[in-house]
């Protein structure tokens, strides 16, 4: 396999469980009077639907046409709306600077080599408004791999050679690396969830002109 379109075509509506800290995130967003939310790598739509239900103006992107199709269908079933766009998070985001009050991305951006992941983080910073919030989760454990065979093309990166995510690079974060790569954020929370993912809730620092 090796690409998300193949995964969604084969497995259908997957990754449906709401991330455990989303209630806290939503509460903080409402306290901030946030309106415009980017769901980066929306998959089949679990968080897009959740945020739309809460009344936010949601834009959702994903690299998979099938994932977006499922998201669109789910929104329609719930009589909700969101802006959907096919896009890879490792390419320049198709949005102007300072567009969003918050960016949400769960178990998405670590699926590439480190330089690509860092580019994605820089784009998250660009499209966020000053003091905007980001809730990002990434892989934390390089030993619990979803493959019996893999290669390690560069440090802290493995590529499964079999299984559902065959051919997809996975960059594995440490707490130190999280703080380094998200240095432009005031980190409000940084913890490991039950699924061995680093979960970061941060506020973009305002940079003096």
Residue ranges and their predicted role:
Residues 118-130:
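A short glycine-rich, Lys/Arg-flanked "PGG" loop and its adjoining helix->strand segment in the class I
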Residues 105-108:
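A short beta-strand submotif of the Rossmann-like class I SAM-dependent methyltransferase core
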Residues 110-112:
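A short His-aromatic
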Residues 40:
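Conserved beta-strand/loop positions that form the S-adenosyl-L-methionine
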Residues 81-83, 98, 131:
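Short acidic capping loops at alpha-helix termini that bridge into adjacent secondary structure
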Residues 1-34, 43-92, 116-119, 135-209:
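Class I (Rossmann-like) S-adenosyl-L-methionine-dependent methyltransferase catalytic domain
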Residues 93-102:
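A short acidic, Gly/Pro-enriched loop at the edge of an enzyme's catalytic core
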